[in-house]
Swiss-Prot record:
Located at the top of the head of the small subunit, it contacts several helices of the small subunit rRNA. The lineage of its organism: Eukaryota, Amoebozoa, Discosea, Longamoebia, Centramoebida. It comes from the Eukaryota. The keyword Transit peptide does not apply. It is found in: Mitochondrion. This is Small ribosomal subunit protein uS13m.
Length: 119
């Protein structure tokens, strides 16, 4: 996955692609978010990357960062909510153990060592 960093490399890598299909390659941006960004900014789905200017690129970059941060905050808030209500997965997060049913007898030794040191 790529990151959206530089205008020149983005345009040179995706010259013949549509803006929407070029944005799909960026980390943290999926088709649903791209469609939302297109509605907010008034993008044309069939506009080529080669016809894009720097102002449009910087606007897309700001929107992509905004949507990526929203998703990141949502995940963080969900984990904190589970910790707060102390359900099973929340307790596993608090104890720094595997959450999704992974094996702990032979794996996940490092977190369990750290827990023993704290106690």
């Amino acid at each position: 996955m790529k990151k959206l960093q530089n205008f020149n490399t983005f345009v040179s890598d995706n010259k013949n692609k549509n803006i929407f299909s070029a944005l799909k390659d960026i980390h943290g941006v999926n088709l649903k978010k791209i469609n939302k960004m297109g509605l907010v900014m008034g993008l044309d789905k069939f506009e080529k990357v080669s016809s894009m200017n720097f102002e449009l690129f910087s606007l897309i970059k700001k929107q992509a960062i905004f949507f990526y941060n929203l998703e990141e905050n949502k995940i963080f808030n969900n984990v904190n909510k589970k910790k707060k209500i102390k359900n099973y997965t929340g307790m596993r997060h608090i104890l720094k153990l595997p959450v999704r049913g992974q094996r702990t007898h032979t794996n996940a030794k490092t977190p369990s060592k750290n827990i023993k040191k704290e106690l």
